[in-house]
């Protein structure tokens, strides 16, 4: 929103996001058949009069059930080359036709809900287009680059915390009359965890 939204859109959404009025925002790019290759998305937005009509589904959307607004990418020119003809939109939570599925049951990161977001004849105002028509894929790619830095930092932090917990555990747990930290096999495992 900060990068490409109009001034009106920024004034409408940024204060709500920054103040906590909106607990989160949703980044709706990934689809079940277009994850690693989001340019192959199928979600469509068709202009009908002064409204965009959106149909499709987005998968693995972080904090969707808490989002006040969604940044959505959809195909607006199906005849364009791959990666072209995709536009970016702002869709408010509670818009009729916007359906948030129950949270996925994940192996980890339970404090961060992940949901499917379905758009079933979801109608949004024409001025919900963010940035230029058919130029939204460039926006998505540039935003993903910054997000990867955050994911890398998060992953490193989780890994280091896991090693800290493991080190604490092996120094407390005893077997055969000694701390398991004294066993060479355990030491190898911790060394591998540190170096990997």
What are these model-predicted stretches?
Residues 20-29:
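A short, Trp-centered hydrophobic/proline-enriched beta-strand micro-motif
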Residues 17, 34-41, 47-48, 52, ...:
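Hydrophobic, small-residue-rich alpha-helical packing segments that form membrane-like cores
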Residues 6, 27, 45, 54-56, ...:
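Buried hydrophobic positions in well-ordered alpha/beta secondary-structure cores of metabolic enzymes
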Residues 88, 98-196:
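Glycine-rich beta->alpha junctions and the first turn(s) of the following alpha-helix
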């Amino acid at each position: 929103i900060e990068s490409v939204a109009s001034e009106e859109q920024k004034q409408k959404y940024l204060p709500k996001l920054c103040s906590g009025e909106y607990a989160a925002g949703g980044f709706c790019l990934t689809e079940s058949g277009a994850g690693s290759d989001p340019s192959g998305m199928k979600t469509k937005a068709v202009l009908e009069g002064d409204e965009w009509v959106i149909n499709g589904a987005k998968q693995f959307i972080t904090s969707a059930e808490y989002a006040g607004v969604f940044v959505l990418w959809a195909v607006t020119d199906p005849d364009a080359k791959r990666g072209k003809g995709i536009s970016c939109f702002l869709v408010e939570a509670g818009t009729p036709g916007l359906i948030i599925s129950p949270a996925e049951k994940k192996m980890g990161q339970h404090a961060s809900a992940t949901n499917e977001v379905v758009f079933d004849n979801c109608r949004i105002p024409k001025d919900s287009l963010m940035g230029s028509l058919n130029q939204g894929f460039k926006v998505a790619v540039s935003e993903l680059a910054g997000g990867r830095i955050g994911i890398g930092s998060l992953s490193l932090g989780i890994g280091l915390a896991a090693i800290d917990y493991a080190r604490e555990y092996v120094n407390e747990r005893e077997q055969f009359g000694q701390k398991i930290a004294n066993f060479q096999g355990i030491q190898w495992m911790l060394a591998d965890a540190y170096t990997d």
